[in-house]
From Swiss-Prot:
Organism, scientific name: Chlorobium limicola (strain DSM 245 / NBRC 103803 / 6330)
Gene Ontology molecular function terms on file: nucleic acid binding
Phylogenetic lineage: Bacteria, Pseudomonadati, Chlorobiota, Chlorobiia, Chlorobiales
Protein name: UPF0102 protein Clim_0016
InterPro entries attached to this UniProt entry: Restrct_endonuc-II-like, tRNA_endonuc-like_dom_sf, UPF0102_YraN-like
CDD domains for the chain: PoNe_Nuclease
Family: Belongs to the UPF0102 family.
Top-level taxon of the source organism: Bacteria
Length: 129
């Protein structure tokens, strides 16, 4: 059964934010936008500023959720992160890029009833040089 991808994505982002808060992260911004680029969640893990991409799928039919964070998507997230850093007083905090993958194990009328969550810490980074 096909599910509304926007609803699934919104639910996944909420579940990810709850997961992070439960792990002691301090959520700063959700759905930060810079031009056409977006970062789903910006949060502090201790003193480390985390830019977090959330991917949610209703099945593995189209692959694991983390597989959709392509090199192009990573570049877009990095561009948005650079923009966000310009808004900070301390423009060079310790940063990292994480991915949270959520697989809906059970759905009921487009609502996630049970799920599996995987947190890929430091999943990618900006290449320098």
């Amino acid at each position: 059964m096909d599910h509304d991808p926007h609803s699934l994505g919104r639910q996944g982002e909420l579940l990810a934010a709850e997961y992070l808060a439960g792990k002691g992260y301090r959520i700063i911004v959700r759905n930060y936008r810079h031009r056409r680029n977006e970062i789903d969640i910006i949060a502090f893990d201790g003193r480390t500023l985390c830019f977090i991409e959330v991917k949610t799928r209703g099945s593995l039919e189209k692959g694991h959720p983390v597989e959709s964070v392509t090199p192009q998507k990573q570049k877009e997230i990095i561009k948005a992160a650079r923009s966000y850093l310009l808004t900070l007083e301390n423009r060079e905090p310790d940063c990292r890029f994480d991915v949270i993958a959520i697989l809906a194990d059970a759905m009921d009328n487009d609502r996630i009833r049970s799920f599996t969550i995987e947190h890929f810490i430091d999943a990618f980074w900006e290449e320098t040089g």
